[in-house]
Amino acid sequence: MTDLVSLSPKPASAPGTRPAAARKVYVHTFGCQMNASDSDRMIELLGRHAFARAETPDDADLILLNTCAVREKAEQKLLSALGRYREVKARRGALIAVSGCVAQQEKDRLLARVPYVDFVFGPDNIGKLPEMVARAERERFAETGWMDSQDYVFPQADPEAARGRPTAFVTAMKGCDNVCAFCIVPHTRGREVSRAFPEIVAECASLAEVGVREVTLIGQNVNSYAGGCTFAELLRRVAAVPGIARIRFTTSHPHDLSDALVAVFRDEPKVMPHFHLPVQSGSDAVLARMRRDYTVAEYLDRFDRLRAARPGIAITTDFIVGFPGEGEADFEGSLALLERARFEQSFSFLFSPRPKTVANLRLGTAPEWQEIPRAVAVERLERLQAAQRRIAAAALAAELGKVVEVLVEGASDEPGERLGRTPENRVVHLAADEAGAPTGALVRARITRAGGSSLSGTPA
């Protein structure tokens, strides 16, 4: 299925504006872990076609901006970044490309509004990137068509690109079949397509062979995975891969959290005691307008079953504040839920109306869809975040004096320290050198300090 926009041929570049030797690509990634994984795939793909990775945009011959459209602010960040890269294009003759969800949603507007963008492409077109780069030397265009589900080919990771890194993302699926009223993802990522489980397991095995210890399975809604087995079964298969010590995944929809998945947390120690389970609101009325397909009580039932199956599990969540029609009582419900659940962390944002979504189309059409004044929404968000900071600080303080396992990910920004994470995904600054805590090692650490968002410790 093709969705192609082509503009007039480009004028020839001035002599000497782009070197003939091996070129460099700089990737600026916005948004989610799926985007981070896509960026890795794009760098690997271009690496097979004589592109090296540029550490700064000033050294790049191709600048790729991999975008997020979940909130309007992300689009504003894109336009700001494009303005900064315009000078690099003028000086080096660099190509500028926009990929990801904003590219999928706003292809025509981007090409018209930003004349120095050379090409635009959606998430389903990553595999064509080398051909698109060559074509962009001749003309400006957008390629944002969807691949049919049966024809979709997941980009293959190059395990060598992960050598020396202890962690890696592994794509399990893409797209989303839910129709949450606030969410643009089904319009920018398409329908759900699951990757066949043997392919996922094989990639995890190849990553383990080059030293990866932890894999994170990613998708817009991994709980609905259907690649030849259930998601719970997939986790058990990955856990059987020699060399893989830790398994994480994201993101999940509470409606699809099965008893079988809860059982995996109970039975499989390689599946880390950390679960991101977005709730969005503590009000049944707001959840219904959001089309989330669960009530607060149903969410808490799943939450409690996870806690019972894996005592000590760190559960994180998302909140949207200021959704249309949210009253003070609705917001108080979110605060009450936060206090009841004691989430390890929550990612909370103001409601951002997105094109084509139900919430955007219904905004202002009825009393229950009235827009919340920004000042009211901002004040509520500040209250929610203050409560979350207090709860998170208490959770970190409770770790003082404990001996925990830390996967060392590399050097810290502070001299004489290494950086790693606990099974619960808590960041630990470890007072050790490379010899005492090499990258990829699982070390025991005694926690000596709890900060606002991280821990400090010494080898135990």
Curated annotation (Swiss-Prot):
GO molecular function: 4 iron, 4 sulfur cluster binding; metal ion binding; N6-isopentenyladenosine methylthiotransferase activity
MTTase N-terminal domain residues: 23-138
Catalysis performed (reactions): N(6)-dimethylallyladenosine(37) in tRNA + (sulfur carrier)-SH + AH2 + 2 S-adenosyl-L-methionine = 2-methylsulfanyl-N(6)-dimethylallyladenosine(37) in tRNA + (sulfur carrier)-H + 5'-deoxyadenosine + L-methionine + A + S-adenosyl-L-homocysteine + 2 H(+)
Cofactor(s) named in the record: [4Fe-4S] cluster
InterPro entries membership: Elp3/MiaA/NifB-like_rSAM, Methylthiotransferase, Methylthiotransferase_N, Methylthiotransferase_N_sf, MiaB_methiolase, rSAM, rSAM_horseshoe, TRAM_dom
Cofactor note: Binds 2 [4Fe-4S] clusters. One cluster is coordinated with 3 cysteines and an exchangeable S-adenosyl-L-methionine.
All copies of domain Radical SAM core, residue ranges: 162-394
CDD domains reported for this sequence: Radical_SAM
GO cellular component: cytosol
Function: Catalyzes the methylthiolation of N6-(dimethylallyl)adenosine (i(6)A), leading to the formation of 2-methylthio-N6-(dimethylallyl)adenosine (ms(2)i(6)A) at position 37 in tRNAs that read codons beginning with uridine.
Assembly description: Monomer.
UniProt protein name: tRNA-2-methylthio-N(6)-dimethylallyladenosine synthase
Organism: Anaeromyxobacter sp. (strain Fw109-5)
